[in-house]
């Protein structure tokens, strides 16, 4: 089932929640209800009004792969990519098509072009009009579905830290 940010925002209010961007992003990317995503985050250590640790996020993504039939691939990892960025080279982010079978090789990076010195949610969404992604900035998570940023924040705020592509295996 597909959900939008607006639907998740209403669910968040009805649960009297704040700082639940990871819950909303997971719900939208994996087609889960807010309640299901909230539960999955809670059992991995998320406390009411707080985010989720990277360990919890990794565990959640692995769980979605093994238990729910999704293929989750790392598309961008800033820690890996920083060593390849020198000077004021112009780049742009465009994700390659995500492999959807076990025999396909995982994606660790995409094209070698970003725009300016910062990689933004807006740029990534514009360059990736198809597919589902969970995007992490410094202290925020959001979902992008078919080029549409599902978030309250103005798209483009914050440098990208990690991006995971999500494909449902049928």
Model-inferred region functions:
Residues 1-3, 89, 131, 162:
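Intrinsically disordered, low-complexity segments enriched in small/polar residues
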Residues 1-74:
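Active-site nucleophile-adjacent alpha helix/oxyanion-hole segment immediately C-terminal to the catalytic cysteine
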Residues 47-139, 145-154:
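Conserved active-site-adjacent core of cysteine acyl-enzyme catalytic domains
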């Amino acid at each position: 089932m597909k959900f939008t940010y607006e639907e998740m925002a209403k669910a968040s209010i009805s649960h009297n929640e704040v700082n639940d961007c990871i819950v909303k992003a997971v719900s939208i990317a994996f087609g889960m209800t807010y309640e299901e995503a909230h539960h999955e985050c809670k059992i991995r250590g998320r406390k009411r009004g707080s985010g989720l640790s990277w360990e919890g996020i990794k565990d959640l993504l692995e769980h979605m792969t093994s238990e729910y039939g999704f293929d989750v691939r790392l598309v961008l990892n800033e820690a890996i990519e920083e060593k390849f960025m020198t000077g004021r080279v112009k780049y742009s982010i465009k994700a390659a098509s995500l492999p959807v079978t076990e025999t396909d090789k995982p994606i660790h990076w995409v094209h070698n072009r970003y725009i300016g010195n910062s990689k933004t949610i807006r740029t990534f969404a514009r360059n990736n009009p198809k597919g589902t992604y969970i995007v992490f900035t410094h202290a925020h998570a959001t979902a992008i579905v078919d080029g549409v940023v599902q978030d309250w924040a103005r798209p483009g705020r914050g440098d990208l830290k990690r991006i995971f592509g999500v494909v449902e295996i049928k």
